[in-house]
Amino acid sequence: MLEGFGEALADREYYLPLPSVADPGPRFAPGEVPPGLSGAAQGIWTVWGGPRTGFAEQGWKIHVSARLDRAQHVLDTVAGICFSEGVPFKHLSARLFFLFLHHKHAGRAQAGKFCAVYPPDTATARRLLERLRDALDGEEGPYVLSDRRYRDSRTVHYRYGSFGGRGRLRADGTREGLVRDGSGREVVDLRLPAFHLPAGIVDPFVEQEEQPHAGPILIRDYEVTRAVRLSNAGGAYQARDRRTGRPVFVKEARAHNGLVFDGTDA
């Protein structure tokens, strides 16, 4: 991500925290909210909880992606399910924040995330994954690089990690999250643009773990030899045409991501 990218969007003359922007555009909010529940602003997010809800320290976090033009419908669906289950969740608060998180130059590990759901245990996570998958069948959204897609869903993803309660300060003053691995040791909660499990944690939502890729990386007839640049819009690669042996340049475009500020994707 470009340093200061979010701060540059908040004001025409000064660097300011992005959430302080005067006009973030149309707001996102659930269409129906049960009595007694209210949302709380947390940076660019709105967090929803209630008397029956509470955040576990860590677990299977669910991320739901959406196309910008379908975001309100997706939010209403996610909110309805979470309210009925009494599970806390959050969503991006406004259109500008959606465009920022999905922009070409935003952080790749965070891109694609529109809603985040925090189930208290694995059984609840499994039930929510199934309900969300069924309710959002037919919806499209960007692939969340830090996560694994749930079955054949195009919008529902999950990863194992901290729910935000445990962390420590680095020497440079920034904070890093911590999570307990399978043996109970505290380790860094790695938020990478690739799916990662702490040692000793097993994915309960797949019948068999996929084997790491071995051999050349192929895009049709082109064998990738080097990544030149990676962004939310897609990658740029040096490659070799396997039919002729000629060196070529391949540019990738990621669907529903790499947005510009009129909402056009890569």
Show where each model-derived region lies.
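Juxta-kinase regulatory segment immediately upstream of eukaryotic protein kinase catalytic domains
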Residues: M1-P26, G167-A227
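ATP-binding glycine-rich loop module of kinase domains
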Residues: G54-A71, D221-A266
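Short amphipathic alpha-helices in soluble, non-transmembrane regions
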Residues: T77-V78, L128-L136
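A conserved alpha-helical element in kinase catalytic cores
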Residues: L68-H91, H103-K104, T124-A125, R254-A266
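A common structural junction motif
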Residues: C82-G86, R133-V144
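Elongated alpha-helical scaffolds
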Residues: R108-C115, P119, A123-E130
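Nucleic acid-processing catalytic cores of prokaryotic defense/repair systems
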Residues: I44, P51-L75, H91-Q110
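Short proline/glycine- and acidic-rich turn/helix-capping motifs at secondary-structure junctions
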Residues: L96-H102, L145-R168
